[in-house]
Amino acid sequence: MVQLAVAQNRIAEIRENLLGNHPDKILVVSHRADWRNAPENSLQGIQNCIDMGVDMVEIDLKRTKDGHLVVMHDKTINRTMNGKGLVEDYTLAELKAMRLKNGVACKTRHQIPTLEEVMLLCKGKIMVNIDKGYDYFQEAYAVLEKTGTVDQCVIKAGLPYEQVKAENGAVLDKVIFMPIVQLHKEGAEAIIDSYQTHMKPAAYELVFDNDNPEVLNLIKKVRDTGSNLFINSLWPELCGGHDDDRAVELHQPEESWGWIINQGAKLIQTDRPALLLEYLRKKK
């Protein structure tokens, strides 16, 4: 009972920081789990994130031949499993008979997880960010309901509000939905205005390949709406050059993570979760 209460408090704390206005608290989002130390999108990688104190883990979804949602980034299993072909051409049992590969392409003991397995592992411990998974919105929501984890999952899409609402109806209002906006592309401001008019999202994922004045003005516009900012530090083209490797390899964390925080970001998605957590703890 005590352990359950602690877990519930952990999710409540993360949700409060995600949904509220607490600029002093930065949430760390780990991209494809802890892929440097475990197979990407694996249960072990997710457990590593839980153990190190990550706030949210990012995953991707595909559907098997027999209709199960599994956690996989690519359309094929060629890169990440000891097999070849499209995920959709295999049954879940066939995929489970194979093994995931690690970052240097060696077969491990780990199996591809289902969304249900991931949500049960994460329940009460860590938030989940479904990135490549909008195509399965309704099916994913059914899994969240079944596992009792609707309150700890974020679903995202880079689509206009009108399309997302038309395709999902009332379900859209039952989840934490985060629009993805590419600030360096035409129409970005119109997408922001559309969402602000209709739903005022808890946060926007902002993508930008430069940090010119036009992009910075749009970042400020989103910040001024009261919605939180989710910014990727994964590689330069996602954050105007203020990426993880700039922090780690060039030893310029203030020009990377510090710059992102100074733009008002509440959530930082990283491929260096342990180092970002260390950086944030030192800043307290």
Give the location of each predicted region.
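Phosphate-group recognition and catalysis centered on beta-loop-alpha active-site segments
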Residues: 2-284
